From Swiss-Prot:
Top-level lineage group: Eukaryota
Coiled-coil region(s): none
High-level lineage: Eukaryota, Viridiplantae, Streptophyta, Embryophyta, Tracheophyta
Signal peptide: 1-25
Keywords annotated in UniProt: Disulfide bond, Redox-active center, Signal
Source organism per UniProt: Arabidopsis thaliana
Gene designation per UniProt: PDIL5-1
Official protein name in the record: Protein disulfide-isomerase 5-1
């Protein structure tokens, strides 16, 4: 095998994995420095998971939140975020998080709803899409009244 052939094979293998990384959905980690500004983004819903690393219920979620992020790709009105209440205690105190995990939906900076349903991607996605539509309609009505 020539030197060129030996270099081509690893490059092909590497290129096979690049699209996977480019398609990887982004779950945005929110911190005390970014939380307030992000959830106040106009006409944007933020579905946020509040957890701590030591919580067995949070650990049990596995890749659920990342899978939801992938499922929500392409929806410009909905962002998926997470807050580590161990390192971002101020955020969790501000929004009154008392148990883990807690899932909250925000729209235009306001809390819309807490999710307490089944913990699977389909249920989470259905919830966030439906609640975001309601929040957007409400915001449009309020804008018209101004």
């Amino acid at each position: 095998m020539t030197l060129g052939a030996r270099l081509v094979a690893p490059m092909i293998i590497l290129l096979l994995f690049i699209p996977i990384e480019l398609v990887k959905a982004e779950v945005i980690t929110l911190t005390p420095e970014t939380f307030s500004d992000k959830i106040k983004e106009k006409d944007t819903a933020w579905f946020v998971k509040f957890c701590v690393p030591w919580c067995k219920h949070c650990k049990k979620l596995g890749n659920l939140w990342e899978d939801l992020g992938k499922a929500m790709e392409g929806d410009d009105e909905i962002e998926v975020g997470e807050v580590d209440c161990g390192t971002s205690r101020a955020v969790c105190t501000k929004v009154e998080i008392h148990s883990y995990p807690t899932f909250m939906l925000f729209y235009n900076g306001e809390e819309v709803s807490k999710y307490k349903g089944k913990r699977d991607v389909e249920s989470l996605k259905a919830f966030v899409v439906e609640e975001t539509e309601k929040a957007a309609e409400k915001a449009q009505l309020e804008d018209k009244e101004l």
